[in-house]
């Protein structure tokens, strides 16, 4: 029954998904349908085999999985989300680093094609888990998206090796100062301290709170008097 369901689902999706084939002459759509039909797997080895097959579908397979996500009022996404989460976990293993690029590209394309905000956020959260500095432009693209901005700034904040790029974005103020200050705190970006201190001069309450938090994490002696004044104003014992 599950296999029939996935077959009907794929029939309603993109015709290009039929094109690529594996050694068993299965199309990408068939490989994904077979994998979804076997999830959740009872044994670890079976699970690994399923993830390996999903990974083998490359960018096109990830995009197709993304297109299968539906709005919450239209159906359930548990199996597809489980598959995407599993593939991302699989390619973030040290010995699978060479397979990560296609998954990252697939997630970026899936985000762009998706029109449902919660599903876009889910896809971006998965990209965050496997992102490299090459994905920074993807996150920057959504910094001004009313719904995705929070996920985008989290992506930047948690991407390894993004310190220099983040500092440049802070200098250009490509996003609200409050969100950028949050990223500084997560990254412990000491080089951003002078900018944060300057921002405090005309910051609103939420931005002040974010800046104080960031400075408490990565600030130097240059921030001590500022933090002390803020603590006293809040009647916090210093």
Could you say what each language-model-derived stretch is?
Residues 53-56, 82-90, 126-129, 155-158, ...:
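Core register positions within helices of long alpha-helical scaffolds
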Residues 22-37, 59-71, 93-112, 121, ...:
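Amphipathic alpha-helical scaffolding segments comprising HEAT/armadillo-like alpha-solenoid repeats
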Residues 16-20:
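Sec/Tat signal peptide C-region and signal peptidase I cleavage site
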Residues 42-43, 72-77, 115-116, 144-148, ...:
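Short inter-helical turns and helix N-cap capping residues of alpha-solenoid HEAT/ARM repeat scaffolds
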Residues 43-47, 62, 76-81, 120, ...:
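Residue-level detector of extended alpha-helical repeat arrays and alpha-solenoid scaffolds
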Residues 37-89, 213, 230:
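Alpha-helical, heptad-rich or low-complexity scaffold/stalk segments
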Residues 1-4:
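Positively charged n-region of N-terminal signal peptides that target proteins for export
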Residues 6-15:
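Bacterial N-terminal signal peptides
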